[in-house]
Each structure stands twice: as structure tokens, then as C-alpha cells.
Amino acid sequence: MSDIVNGLGRTTAYGALGLVLLVLGIVLVDILLPGRLGRQIWEERNRNAAVVLSSALLGVGGIVFTSIWTTYDDFGKGLVSTAVFGLLGLVMMAVAFLVLDLITPGRLGATLVEQEPHPAVWVTASCNLAVSAVMCASIA
């Protein structure tokens, strides 16, 4: 019975940490894109912003999953390493976004929240997923 309780505690801790990292991912995308992300997606139904946010969430989820899956036997060390890898993944995705913005014409953030579909959205989403895949491979 204590194994179940112990497992529930660990699952709750990792789950809460994962949720915090996902929320930080939402905040990060909201900071990088002009305007209010929630309003753009839920009220204005902006597909471009939704694709960028979705790719960031999938990326963060993949990083957290890989970090938990390959975690240390020591619970505390595993929890800290998951937090650190998750935060590093967020930083790396932000840096990749800023580099992409630097090397492409115009302001990438403004382009990504246009109402009309734009190919830059798919490039940005792919960049998020690629950075996350590299992070996952590095963790594993």
C-alpha cells in the first residue's frame, strides 16, 4: 500500500511540475507574440497563433516526458533535473524564435498573429518541435 501512496505522491509532483512548465510555455509564447494570446486564439480564432502555441506545448510536453522517463532514481534529483531541463527547453525555444526573427524579413511575432494563414507559422512551429527533439535526445 505504501508503494501506491509513494507512487501517487511522485506522480502528483511530476504532474504539477509539468503543468507549471506548460503554463510557463504559454506565458513565453504570449510574451514573444504581440497582443494578448488568449484573446487572439479564443476570441479572434487566430489559427496562426494557435499553431505556434500548440507546437510550443507539444515541445515542452516532449521535453518533460523525456526528462521524467529517463529520470534519476533519487526522487528529489529527478524532480530538479526535470525542472531544469524543462526551463532550459523553454529558453532554447525562445532563443530559436529570436534567431528566426533576426534572420527573416519583418517582425516575426507580428507575422505570426496575422489573421490570414502565413507559411512562417509552419516554419516557427517546426523550429519549436525541432528544438524540443534536440533537447529530448540530449536528455536521453
List the predicted regions and their residue ranges.
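Alpha-helical transmembrane segments and their immediate juxtamembrane interface regions
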Residues: 86-114
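Membrane-interface helix-loop junction between the first two transmembrane segments
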Residues: 24-43
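Membrane-interface helix termini and inter-helical loops of multi-pass transporters
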Residues: 1-5, 38, 68-79, 110
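Alpha-helical transmembrane segments
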Residues: 3-21, 77-92
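A generic, lipid-embedded transmembrane alpha helix
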Residues: 48-68, 129-131
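Juxtamembrane boundary at the C-terminal end of a transmembrane helix
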Residues: 133-140
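Membrane-interface segments at loop-to-transmembrane junctions
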Residues: 39-51, 109-125
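Alpha-helical transmembrane segments of multipass membrane proteins
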Residues: 18-26, 89-97, 128-132
